[in-house]
Amino acid sequence: MRSSYSEEDVILLLKDITGMVEPQPAKVREKLIQSGKHYSEMLPVEYVPTDQYMQVYHNALKHYAKPVANAVGMLADKIIENKGKKIVLVSLARAGIPIGILVKRYIKFKYGINVPHYSISIIRGRGIDDNAMKYLLEKYRPQQILSVSYTHLRAHETRSNL
């Protein structure tokens, strides 16, 4: 499956639908959703970010890189402290992947451990991907599997600012 992420950072446990579903613009998808089609049966058109978007991104990066790095470090340290070194990170596809990658990289940098990081899908109204969970549970003990998300990061960032 084609991805902008390196397999060294994350293994996507997603069904490859390349060539099976044609990406559609947001307005078309919204009309289809209103007519009863489920959003998970469609793909968005992936646009190249505009210069204005990239300017906002770089500005946010400049202002928030250090607090995010501190929160990632605190979270990763707590993970190792509470779960040990034989962990498996699991993030939700799209929104959870960046946090999972940052935590994985921090653990490798500080502890010298290359922990696995997988990403799975959860679909509103349909639930978590059973096949992905089955795969993970066949390969790892339940105690090793740890879900990471932006919510975990925000909780640690908030505590560090108290």
Where are these regions (language model features)?
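Glycine-rich phosphate-binding "P-loop"
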Residues: Y53-V68
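Conserved small/polar residues in nucleotide/adenosyl-binding loops
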Residues: T151-T158
